[in-house]
Amino acid sequence: MAETLTPRQIVERLDQFIIGQKEAKKAVAIALRNRYRRSLLDEKLRDEVMPKNILMIGPTGVGKTEIARRLAKLVGAPFIKVEATKFTEVGYVGRDVESMVRDLVETSVRLVKERKMSEVKDRAEQQANKRLVELLVPGKQKQTIKNPLELLFGGQASQPDNGHSHDDEQVEKKRRQVAWQLANGQLEDEMVTIEIEEQPPMLFDFLQGAGIEQMGVNMQDALGSLMPKRRKKRRLKVSEARKVLINEEAQKLIDMDEVTQEAIRLAEQSGIIFIDEIDKIARGKEVSGSADVSREGVQRDILPIVEGSTVMTKYGPVKTDHILFIAAGAFHMAKPSDLIPELQGRFPIRVELAKLSVDDFVSILVEPNNALIKQYQALLATEGINLEFSDDAIRKIAEVAFEVNQTTDNIGARRLHTILEKLLEDLLFEAPDIGLNRVVITPQYVEQKLGNIVKNKDLSEFIL
């Protein structure tokens, strides 16, 4: 189970995707393990143990967000990333800080719902296949009266059959044959007409911006249930229709009240909220006046959420006491001490992330499971091209990335995306027509494609 991973094992898992930043990985690994330790305590003490929130300090592109995202994915915890600059003080137009908790609960509901639907997938598939058989071999239509008032005007209700007719036996025989063909994948490309529930039109979205969202009420859900449900017909291949029907049947098999309760519990006990750009709402020396007051107001609004409070959502009240908050910022223009003292105290663990070196860039290019070079190799393999990079070429690319970051804005590892795209631009364009099955990238090729751009500072700023 991911919840029982030791801090060392968590760091090893994170190492598969993120290069360096040992201190930051260590801090989040301890925070995650402490959650597991807390779950083993008796209930009275468990409520007293609060998570130690983390403040990550470091330039953009060094792995702050990725560490938090991978951590959440590792344990299947609900995770959201928000930007502190998007929030406004209560009473002003814009998003209030409580919306981050509502977003977390939405993510949690989606996670739990997907998990529950995967648990009933086999049963849902059986029901979907039954419906497909009935659609492919429809039975004899019986006369039924949907409106009881028809009886007053001479209509007759359908009588139940006392036995099977010859036609019914033929239909059953045909259905058994079709069921066997479906099970053996012989009818995947056959066309079938299915009825699916149509989503009600989004009529009430305009109300959400008028403060309704802050009340924890979803007008679409509240008023949508009063509107009649419409069904529309779609003609699909059996393989596609099965997916639609499995989804419909799975929805019927899960209890949404149970999903909601579990989702709220998961968000409260395991949720992770990543607040980016928190340095932008700190009191910098160069900022004064109303903007400074507004920033401090947002900090004071964030404070009760981080301290622990109850937020109303459309799924019910959610306590934030045990949600793990990870804040991050570059802190170029401000210092962590420029945050209001109360908020500083709520982020007791501070980790400084190092700037990336040339060696870090080399490692980022080749070591992670999702390394950029591996991605480009996989993309070009679809065109029948075996793309290779010499070790010297990889180091040259890393040196170019480091140099451009030094001479222009430092955007960390994101610089590699721009550089590799520029380096391989011609190859990606010509790949379908080039007629080669092997291409080797050398230092000379890197110099040829990027050398002049790197030397010209103006070009670097615009192109790389």
Swiss-Prot record:
Kindly list the GO molecular function terms attached to this UniProt entry. Answer: ATP binding; ATP hydrolysis activity; peptidase activity; proteasome-activating activity
Region annotation (Disordered) ranges: 154-174
Q: Which SMART domains match?
A: AAA, ClpB_D2-small
**Sorted alphabetically, which Pfam families does this protein's record hold?**
AAA (PF00004), AAA_2 (PF07724), ClpB_D2-small (PF10431)
Give me the stretches of Basic and acidic residues compositional bias: 163-172
CDD domains under this entry? RecA-like_HslU
Against SUPFAM superfamilies, the record matches this protein to: P-loop containing nucleoside triphosphate hydrolases
Residues binding ATP are I19, G61, V62, G63, K64, T65, E66, D276, E342, R414
Q: What does this protein do?
A: ATPase subunit of a proteasome-like degradation complex; this subunit has chaperone activity. The binding of ATP and its subsequent hydrolysis by HslU are essential for unfolding of protein substrates subsequently hydrolyzed by HslV. HslU recognizes the N-terminal part of its protein substrates and unfolds these before they are guided to HslV for hydrolysis.
What does the subunit section of this Swiss-Prot or TrEMBL entry state? Answer: A double ring-shaped homohexamer of HslV is capped on each side by a ring-shaped HslU homohexamer. The assembly of the HslU/HslV complex is dependent on binding of ATP.
What is the name listed in the Swiss-Prot or TrEMBL entry for this protein?
ATP-dependent protease ATPase subunit HslU
* Organism, as annotated: Geobacillus thermodenitrificans (strain NG80-2)
Lineage of the native species?
Answer: Bacteria, Bacillati, Bacillota, Bacilli, Bacillales
